[in-house]
C-alpha cells in the first residue's frame, strides 16, 4: 500500500523571480520500503525533501502529493510533523538555551496531543530515551546539552537520528545524513535508521554516496537530474553510479530528449 504518492511535482524558490528547482517529480513509496534518491549537487534532491516537509522558502507551483491518503500540500509543517513526517537535516541547527531533553519531550508530547493521547510522564519518557540512546551509543549527558550547541558534525548527525528514533515517524526523510561521517559513526547512524523499519513505515534517504546503502538496504534507487527523477533501479544502480559517475545518465537522457 502506498504511503507517499508524488505526481508531477513542480516547485520554485519562494521569492520574486525565484527559479524553478523541481520540474515534474513522480515517485511512489510504499509502506515498509526504503528508497534512496541520488544525484549531482543542484539536481533537486534536498529541495524535494524540504518541500515534502513544508519548508516555506519553496513554493509548489504544480502537482500533487498524497501521504497516507491525505493531501500533504494542504498541511502546515507542524501538521505534517504530527502526522508522522520527519526530516533529518543535512545541516542540523543549534538551539541555544534549550536542552535536548526538553526539546524532545516537547516534540513527543506535541505529537501525542495531536492524536488525543496522554502525554508521557517523566519516567516513561526517560525509559524511551534510554532505549534509543543505547541503540545509537550516545552518552546520557547529551540530554542535558543545548540542542546541537557545541556538537561536532558527527554528533549533530547522530542527534538527528536519535530524535528520529525517539519521535518514531511514519515517513522518515533523511537529507544527506551520511555526509561527513566516519565509517563507525555511519554504521551507528544506519542502525538507528534501520530500527525504524517496519511494515507501517517508510524511509526516503537522500545521499551522494552508495556507502550509506551498504547499511540501509534500499528497495529502490532513484537518480535525480535537473529537478526530475530520470532513472530508477535497485541497489545495483547505486553501485554503478559509484563506479561510473553520472555522465552516462546525462547522455542517456539527452538521447531520449
Locations of the language-model features?
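Helical segment within the ABC ATPase nucleotide-binding domain
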Residues: 186-199
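The feature captures the beta-strand-to-loop junction immediately N-terminal to the Walker
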Residues: 38-40
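ABC-family P-loop ATPase nucleotide-binding domains
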Residues: 93-170
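Conserved structural motif at the start of ABC-family nucleotide-binding domains
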Residues: 4-6, 22-24
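ABC ATPase NBD Q-loop/coupling interface
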Residues: 64-80, 148
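Conserved beta-strand-loop-alpha-helix hinge in the C-terminal portion
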Residues: 220, 224, 228-251
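Walker B catalytic motif
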Residues: 173-177, 184
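Conserved hydrophobic segment flanking the Walker A/P-loop of ABC-type ATPase nucleotide-binding domains
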Residues: 13, 29-31
